Amino acid sequence: MFRPAAVLVTIMADEATVLLTKRSSALKHHPGQVAFPGGKVDPGDRGAVGAALREAEEEVGLRQDSVEVLGTLSPHLTVTGFEVTPVIAFAHGAFAPRPEAGEVEEAFFVPFDHVTDPAHFRIEARRWRGVMRRYYAVPWGPYYTWGATARMLRGLADRLARCD
């Protein structure tokens, strides 16, 4: 059974960028990986949207009242047992992330047009728990975004392509 989780895909409307984080190297799960702010849906959350907003505020200081939720993408099942719902939101105005040291090593912004252009994605493979797995990757500068986060970005790119 998959555990419910959610991430906030924050589009900085004024700068046309997407907020990403580099997870702390001290974390048990996915240390040092690039990810959206997010985490498990807690009993007190208002579903996936509430969890994504709460986690973004905890991890990078993005106030819940400073974003406009646009909707969600289809949930993604991860090899680590989570059903992750990407929550898409606009943030208006300036925002200076304040990474929570225990969870986030760094917060940064990637150009929206880079992570929503299918031409920037590639499919790679690596062995995980004895099984060869294929996954999306979308590198940008010094950042290597892969796996579930890249798959969610690719899902957003594909959704936008259908809107054209």
Regions found by a protein language model. Name each.
Residues K40-G141, T145, R154-D164:
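Unchanged
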Residues M1-F36:
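N-terminal strand-loop-strand
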Residues E15-K22, P97-P99, W146-G147:
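Short, well-ordered strand-loop elements centered on a beta-strand within folded domains, enriched
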Residues T10, T149-L156:
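Buried hydrophobic packing segments
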